[in-house]
UniProtKB/Swiss-Prot annotation:
Pfam families: EFG_C, EFG_III, EFG_IV, GTP_EFTU, GTP_EFTU_D2. GO terms for molecular function: GTP binding; GTPase activity; translation elongation factor activity. Its main location: cytoplasm. Belongs to the TRAFAC class translation factor GTPase superfamily. Classic translation factor GTPase family. EF-G/EF-2 subfamily. It is found in: Cytoplasm. GO terms for cellular component: cytoplasm. This is Elongation factor G. Catalyzes the GTP-dependent ribosomal translocation step during translation elongation. During this step, the ribosome changes from the pre-translocational (PRE) to the post-translocational (POST) state as the newly formed A-site-bound peptidyl-tRNA and P-site-bound deacylated tRNA move to the P and E sites, respectively. Catalyzes the coordinated movement of the two tRNA molecules, the mRNA and conformational changes in the ribosome. SUPFAM superfamilies: EF-G C-terminal domain-like (SSF54980), P-loop containing nucleoside triphosphate hydrolases (SSF52540), Ribosomal protein S5 domain 2-like (SSF54211), Translation proteins (SSF50447). GTP binds at residues 17-24, 81-85, 135-138. It comes from the Bacteria.
Amino acid sequence: MARAFPLERVRNIGIAAHIDAGKTTCTERILFYSGVVHKMGEVHDGAAVTDWMAQERERGITITAAAISTTWNDHRINIIDTPGHVDFTIEVERSMRVLDGVIAVFCAVGGVQPQSETVWRQADRYSVPRMVFVNKMDRTGADFLKVHGQIKNRLKANAIPIQLPIGAEGDLSGIIDLVKNKAFIYKDDLGKDIEETEIPDHMKELAAEWRAKLMECVAETDEELIEVFLETEELSEAQLASGIREGVLNHGLVPLLCGSAFKNKGVQLLLDAVVDYLPAPVDVPPIQGLLPNGKEAVRPSDDNAPFSALAFKVMADPYGKLTFVRMYSGVLEKGSYVLNSTKNEKERISRLIILKADDREEVDALRAGDLGAVLGLKNTTTGDTLCTTDDPIVLETLYIPEPVISVAVEPKTKGDMEKLSKALLSLAEEDPTFRVSTDPETSQTVIAGMGELHLEILVDRMLREFKVEANIGAPQVSYRETIRASSKGEGKFARQTGGKGQYGHVVIEMEPGEPGSGFEFVNKIVGGIVPKEYIKPAESGMRETCESGVIAGYPLIDVKVTMVDGSYHDVDSSEMAFKIAGSMAFKDGVKKCNPVLLEPMMKVEVEIPEDFLGSIIGDLSSRRGQVEGQSIDDGLSKVQSKVPLAEMFGYATQLRSMTQGRGIFSMEFSHYEEVPRNVAEAIISKNQGNS
């Protein structure tokens, strides 16, 4: 079956902003005017189509990134309504990565908020072309040109209005289109009866001023246009439109539009602009990946290229496990077998779905450029590549770091234990940086993640989405142990309690292993000093001790153990005796090998206004941080540092208080480093006191 829309007429866009800028209402209106829904849903009524989880409808916020397809002016538009709550995990960035363009929604009253700065920088990181919709122009205090100034100054964007509001607050009656040089007056409350007319007399001077600025801004992005503009001081409507599109695609400019989604004004013009100015899949660089031989390759947006797609979200759903995919090349057909090249496992495609929020349209195939969902994938998780078995490729994927912080979690009522297990399993499937395990000593359930904020949000989701109330322990840092010297260790387990005794004797040589090697065991027993059947139990005893630690109860890493000697008894020796002897030898060896404690170091990047630079650097130093670099750009300071995770608890609150809410930071795991002796002694004595 041929594709319904040529690739040139496909738009994959995200609608992103800070909380309460009106993203979801904006998406609702887009769906209403494009005919996907026939009745408008209001977020505050709990009826919004994209807020399809019951918990979202209760709270009037968007928790998950809902993917919806619609059409406008004979174009397919796939929309992701992203959560406004931006935390520091990788989820939001992944959403950004599968988009080709973004509508950044700003509130006409609140303007640029700290959170909108975060969203903007994430779009910068993935070089996503964007346009701005200044929403809530009907609100008291709305000021379109003030928001334009904030975007230019605080976000350093070459933003230029392509529209102007006619009136504001309660008097918002229409919009001036500076490209067409026409006014659009809204005649009814539903926003369907729109009159295209001449610009009102009282707005002509302002419109002429901003149209001249628009022409100048557009001309500067293109050599041919600048020649025309210098000669005639005028650009035609077609030249303006093509210049704006070119400027958006090459990140040279950001068009500003305005309106009020809630009052049904400006949404159709916004849809026109999506079609006119945001990129199709063929307008952005082809996705890069690695072939099995390690060479780099690209996959062009083309139905005839080998199939490749990226799983960007996994969600539990009444219909089963939904895996959202972005199709980059080729065709994916229902019932086919594909390769998950990230895990090197085959998967069967049971059903293919295009989502229209709680409405689902089953399709026989997804094609290059599509956003859709797959049912039936058993082993695919967020960030995995799906491709053809004949032409495998692993698409650019994000490094998924190991968790560095853990907390014990238990349900408030014992009857909720099964619900808690299901909730944790479901959350872990969605987020690969979230891990669940059981502490072998206490039998407590332990959850681990990338930081305090990450775990707070997941625990909040357990309550909201799965109705499980949980008690959470204090955050624990995942320390590690290792050794710095070489030595011998010996363990002899001999017990006689009448009848058959127990006897095992193990001698080992211990030395530091290669970084990242974990636990390495070498058997050098010769001549049957210790029978073969006792070697494995001895190794098993060492491994278990290695996992539970020796000096402070943390896993021991990067150690090489060679079993060189030992003895046994024909009658009294057993596998259990050698397991215990192996553990004893390991502990003996570690104590002689200068054991040390390691702690996770975090790569911390702080962005603050220049005025706060001194106090922020001082605060990082007081947290045992090492400042590695700093830069100042237009009054915004960036500080790069490495700080122990143990010193970063509560930092988000502290940073907000030190910078009046204007500072933001990102934090990710860097490496393990030796803990200073005085700090290590305190940790060891505390843990030994608890054991």
